[in-house]
Amino acid sequence: MSILADTEKKMATALEFFQKEIRAFRTGKAHPALVETVTVDVYGTTMRLSDLASISVADTRQLVISPYDANNVSAISKGIIAANLNLQPDAEGAIIRIKIPEPTAEYRNEVIKQLRRKSEEAKVTIRNVRREANDKLKKDSDLTEDAVKGMEKKIQELTDKFCKQIDEMSKQKEADLSSI
């Protein structure tokens, strides 16, 4: 694989990781990502909630969790409480309803700080990928000096593109958090 293609793949992976991280930030709207990674102790082992139940959005402020096995309702409720997500599960027979509370201004400010920190971490990761690629280029004795400069320019363009995408995602998420 060429250095350029490898670099782009690593940067795309960093971007995907960032997307997954910020998806879990609570904006006050119900979204399955809020709870799908919660771990639940069932069958003598620990499993992710998304493997034990279907998670759907009833309305903008409510999630509905339908366990595949109705015997797991109490274990799922305990897992959600233990995850410290500030969510209160309400078991109604074989389903669990979770009302998403309105975030406070203090909570929003804290989440925005976390968002900015995660955004900067993602950009640092992308810049580290750029540095590694540039180091590989310089060590490659088959390339001429002009070819190295051209590749470095393309790598910088990739870096700028991915950093810009991170900034745009951060601004969008920050707007979502601020408009609640």
Curated annotation (Swiss-Prot):
The species this protein was found in: Chlamydia felis (strain Fe/C-56) (Chlamydophila felis)
Q: Which InterPro entries match?
A: Ribosome_recyc_fac (IPR002661), Ribosome_recyc_fac_dom (IPR023584), RRF_sf (IPR036191)
Q: Which GO terms describe its molecular function?
A: ribosomal large subunit binding
Q: Where is the signal peptide?
A: none
Record-level GO BP terms: translational termination
Q: Which domain of life is it from?
A: Bacteria
A cellular component term from Gene Ontology for this protein is: cytoplasm
This molecule's function is given as: Responsible for the release of ribosomes from messenger RNA at the termination of protein biosynthesis. May increase the efficiency of translation by recycling ribosomes from one round of translation to another.
User: What name is this protein filed under?
Assistant: Ribosome-recycling factor
Q: Does the keyword Cytoplasm apply?
A: yes
Q: Which family does it belong to?
A: Belongs to the RRF family.
Keyword list (alphabetical) reads: Cytoplasm, Protein biosynthesis
The set of disulfide-linked cysteines is: none
According to its UniProt record, where is this protein located?
Answer: Cytoplasm
